[in-house]
Amino acid sequence: MNLVNLTINNKSVSVPKGSTILDAAKKLNIKIPTLCHLNMSEVNIVNQCSSCRVCMVSVGKGLVPACGTLAKEGMNVQTNTKEAINARKRVVELLLSDHPQDCLICDKNGNCELQSIAANLGIREIRFKGEQSFAKTDTSTKSIIKNYDKCILCRRCETMCNDIQTVGVLSGVNRGFNTKVDTFFNTNLCDTECTFCGQCISVCPTGALTEVNNIPLVWDALHQNEKTVVVQVAPSVRVAIGEEFGLEAGTISTGKMVAALKSLGFKYVFDTNFGADLTIMEEAAEFINRFKENKNLPILTSCCPAWINFIEKNYPEHLNLTSTCKSPQGMFGAIAKNYLAPKVLNIEPKNMYVVSVMPCVAKKYECSRNELGQDNIPDVDISITTRELAKMIKEAGIDLANLDEEPFDSPLGESTGAADIFGTTGGVLEAALRTAYEWITNKELKDVNFSLVRGFEGIKEASIDVDGTIVNVCVVSTLGNARKIMDEVISGKSKYHIIEVMACPGGCVAGGWQPYHHGDYDIIKKRAQGLYNIDESKKLRKSHENPSIITLYNEFLDKPCSNIAHKYLHTHYFNKSKIYKNEESLTTNE
């Protein structure tokens, strides 16, 4: 490896050739502020446009941006000269002069990178006055709010949308003072190819991109006495919510989270993991049927709503490959309202209000899909995110970190370890393989850990020997990688039998409205490890071993993929390509 030797603040350091001054400074634990820069090399996410100029440092007699200047042999860098510090201050002051001064009521207050840098630089007044740019706020979707008055043109969202997700909704428009990152022709997000994956939100350093706030609606539901309000919680939430209360990323906070939800006033606190186990029952059966018939392969998983939006808009002619299974959120809601409510609690489905807590803003949109319900009663009434739940807990004055742990309620609170790993890339496929293997072979699977489908590579593939039969599998993370694999499928080059797709890099643990990771991918890794730790700790690690699931089939669903199971647990998809004027319903079993 070719190394470059340089000095930063009189400290010597050696870095690989091609490294930047910022890379070298990090090796010395010297902090240089950045706004536009984002480098999550583990998942190939890099935004290095050097546009904000907040990272200016002194080299010789001049100033250069640390994030975009390569380290050179013998270079002498000073990060804390008067010239460098004043340059940073001026840049931040200019940004603030064209920025709304509403920090106290901004959704990003306390997590805003611009706010943090301004505080660290000791900026206490806005010296520059003048005309402010204006952009309308887009509230057209049920998931994302676009408030570009707060945009600082860092281009992170543009990189994420175009380079990583290949959706291509956001781009720079206009010139000079009128420059902004926007949709084509200032089109509302609801009328674009946006999949609502929320990754633009996860990397936005300010409050320019946020989620639709559903907290008031949940409070209203909790404070009225007309309906029984129940809540379900996704697996990724339990290993991330602790971050909002000072706990380390990946801390397993399941029991404390349940206690907090009960303190908020939810009548019953259930686990989306029950829905995940149920999803595996249906999806494994569906896969086995298709595999034996060699029909509609490869089967594409359907748990991720952003992925479903993506394939509906980009590959509608291949929707026949998509599993008809609802997501765990949808399956849970359907069972809660059509089994739990009438048969266990003796109440009408319309009198149950189901709230979901998800790591994902696309789940808000998923709840609103008309096909996800029965008789105009939605499976899930409303979805909030991990951060929204944290806000509700704080509003109620609850100290989550010091709560005594409480268990989920029965019967929809029981789950296996297979359900927990749904929250990380490869988890859905691994859970499906655990069940499919035993159903195909009628033999016990001794080692349930499928390490070949684990890890954070964007595309992982493996050939699994199922008692002499080879099953070729693929795990895909990010929509850009999904596009690559779909193009292989279309060209006939694909050898896969089953493909798992998650829109977020690393899976749901990196969802668009989890606690902000600020570009630190180690946080996402710790969350994923937390889920694997939960799986390892459970006695039952195969979905078909869940006693409550077995009871549900015996009492209500009959068997996987039965007629009644299809009625409540399966769905259909639509051609949403802009090429077509009318939505066309497409299902995989027609």
Q: Where in the sequence are the language-model features?
A:
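Iron-sulfur-associated redox domains of electron-transfer enzymes in respiratory
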Residues: 5, 18-74, 80-84, 88, ...
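Structural motif corresponding to the C-terminal cap of alpha-helices
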Residues: 165, 204, 340-344
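Eukaryote-biased recognition of intrinsically disordered, low-complexity regulatory segments
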Residues: 1-11
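Helix-enriched interaction subdomains in cytosolic or periplasmic regions
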Residues: 188-210, 312-316, 328, 383
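Fe-S ferredoxin-like electron-transfer domains
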Residues: 53-196, 209-221, 228
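Cysteine-centered loop/knuckle micro-motif
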Residues: 161, 204, 253
